[in-house]
Amino acid sequence: MGLSDGEWQLVLNVWGKVEADIPGHGQEVLIRLFKGHPETLEKFDKFKHLKSEDEMKASEDLKKHGATVLTALGGILKKKGHHEAEIKPLAQSHATKHKIPVKYLEFISECIIQVLHSKHPGDFGADAQGAMNKALELFRKDMASNYKELGFQG
């Protein structure tokens, strides 16, 4: 399940492109998530009122939250699989406070892949997509494992 050094390099190379515009990427990821999986919007009290894509694009709070999500994910990816210290508090809050099911982590992972592919096609070919899929799968697996320890069946 682990990634090779070369795969991690592919992940981190494209992540460098994300970091050039974290708020823009984060906003686009969340908009794709909410439009493609409207049920996920119910977990976000401060975004529930946003019905149209235009309203979502105009929301500074949504942009800020997108930046928070991708900043946290970037910190995890940079650990190259040695991310237990970063995952534990994230799993704790997502299991006990926010009650975010693992399925929703799958949904947002798909959205991240889609956004990277649309924004960076030259830097996100099949090899990079495969590596990012593996990295996000590792993240989800470790989140799910922590959820289980916390007794959350999400």
Curated annotation (Swiss-Prot):
Q: What class of enzyme is it?
A: oxidoreductase
Q: Where, by residue number, does nitrite bind?
A: H65
| PTM-bearing positions, type Phosphoserine | S4
The cysteines joined by S-S bonds are none
Q: Which Gene Ontology BP annotations are present?
A: oxygen transport; removal of superoxide radicals
Spell out the reaction equation it catalyses: Fe(III)-heme b-[protein] + nitric oxide + H2O = Fe(II)-heme b-[protein] + nitrite + 2 H(+); H2O2 + AH2 = A + 2 H2O
Q: Name one GO molecular function term.
A: nitrite reductase activity
Q: Where is the Globin domain?
A: 2-148
Q: Where does O2 bind?
A: H65
In this chain, heme b is annotated as bound at H94
Q: Describe the protein's quaternary organization and the partners it interacts with.
A: Monomeric.
What is this protein for, i.e. what is its function? Monomeric heme protein which primary function is to store oxygen and facilitate its diffusion within muscle tissues. Reversibly binds oxygen through a pentacoordinated heme iron and enables its timely and efficient release as needed during periods of heightened demand. Depending on the oxidative conditions of tissues and cells, and in addition to its ability to bind oxygen, it also has a nitrite reductase activity whereby it regulates the production of bioactive nitric oxide.
- What family is it from? Belongs to the globin family.
Protein name per its UniProtKB record: Myoglobin
Taxonomic lineage is: Eukaryota, Metazoa, Chordata, Craniata, Vertebrata
